[in-house]
Structure formats: structure tokens, C-alpha cells
Amino acid sequence: MSSGLYSMEKKEFDKVLDLERVKPYGDTMNDGKVQLSFTLPLKNNERSAEAAKQIALKMGLEEPSVVMQQSLDEEFTFFVVYGNFVQSVNYNEIHVEAVNSEILSMEETDEYIKENIGRKIVVVGASTGTDAHTVGIDAIMNMKGYAGHYGLERYEMIDAYNLGSQVANEDFIKKAVELEADVLLVSQTVTQKNVHIQNMTHLIELLEAEGLRDRFVLLCGGPRINNEIAKELGYDAGFGPGRFADDVATFAVKTLNDRMNS
């Protein structure tokens, strides 16, 4: 039989969501339960487990508990820690600038281009700089797309050119001019030491130096990119995790149409 530890009848629990004091949800409302995972460069033993608990305490978690520890090799150990987060955030004070309020489907995007732009648009994309990863740019550009969302190559009214990975910014710009691109899409997967920020800034500087910045709708995407960061760097929009070709295409065609009519 259950001890009653989780019985709603034997214990007082918060049941109301307060948007001014939002906390993580574990088992019940406002309990602040969180799960944290990290690796320590230490052997797998009792001392390293205690080190993991103390790190969690210094992060502000109460009653931390190491629930899993596993050796990665002789000198490194992976930990999973549970704890209680006692702080909260005021959800009502959080304001985020969304890229798109309404996402068009592939068919709707094609129809929008026909009605408002009147010609095919050209999109050139690449993983620029030293980034050798193509998973991000392929998910947006390739015909098969990703997770049930077709890529830009399948769109009837979009000529999509995927230049692949490790494309120098200078070559990227040269190809964009050659293809008379309307939209440039930069994918950045590698983010160690903020190399993605440096590379994206370099592209902006090159475009501005050549007087080409306003010629293109300039977009970027990646696991550590959001719209706020993108706009701070000088891009028109940024797309992070959970975004698909639909999101990119919708913003691109609407922005292009606005510029043509301004």
C-alpha cells in the first residue's frame, strides 16, 4: 500500500497557477522540482557525488539529490541531480518579439508569392565559416525537409540553392550576387567560444562594406540563435530550435513583399 506521500488528501498542495510567480512543475503546482544533468572531471565515487550536490546547492537548488552517476571514462563522471528551485519568474513581465504571428503552409506561401511578388524568389543558404554541419541547413532547404515539413526546394515559387557547409562568407556573398538572390539563409550549428557570433558578424561587415546589406533579406538559424540575437547582429530575423521551412518562408516572402512596396 502507498504511504500516502503523494496523496492529495493527506498533504496540502498548491493547485493554482500564479503567472506572477511561475515555478517549475514536477509532481504538483509550484513545487519547483527540477532535474539537472552535468559532467564533472572527477572519478566516479562518493566524493564526486558530494561535489555534484554542492554545485547544485551553489546554483540555488534546495535539498539536491544525486539520483544517477555514471562513469564516462576513468576521470569523468556524468550526474543527474534532482532539487527544489525556490525562486520564481513573473510571466506577465516577459515580452518576446515573435518572428511570425501566422505561419503559411507551403501551398499558401506559393500562392502568396504568385499574388504579391509575381515571380519566383531566389533563396541561397549555407553553413558558413568553418561550420561543417549541414543538418540545420538541410532541414530547411532540402526537398524532403524535416519532421513532416517540406524544405524550400519543394516550393513551386522558390528557387532554393543549398551551398552546403564550410562556405566562406566571401564566397557566400559572391554566389548570392551571381544567382541574384532575394534571401540569404545562414546556418550556424557550432557555437563553442561564440564562434557563431563572430562569423555572423563578419558576414554583416562584409555585406555592409560592399554596399549589399539592403539588397537581401538576411536570415540566420541554429540551436543557439533566436530572433533577438539575430536582430542585434544586424539580421532581419533569427530562427532557433523548433522552427521549420514554413517559418522561414513565411517571414522571407512577407518581408520581401513589404520592401518591394515600401
UniProtKB/Swiss-Prot annotation:
It holds the Pfam family B12-binding. GO terms for molecular function: cobalamin binding; D-lysine 5,6-aminomutase activity; metal ion binding; protein dimerization activity. It comes from the Bacteria. The keyword Isomerase applies. Its cofactor is adenosylcob(III)alamin; pyridoxal 5'-phosphate. Its EC number is 5.4.3.3. It catalyses: (3S)-3,6-diaminohexanoate = (3S,5S)-3,5-diaminohexanoate; D-lysine = (2R,5S)-2,5-diaminohexanoate. Transmembrane segments: none annotated. Heterotetramer of 2 alpha and 2 beta subunits. This is Lysine 5,6-aminomutase beta subunit. It comes from Acetoanaerobium sticklandii (strain ATCC 12662 / DSM 519 / JCM 1433 / CCUG 9281 / NCIMB 10654 / HF). The lineage of its organism: Bacteria, Bacillati, Bacillota, Clostridia, Peptostreptococcales.
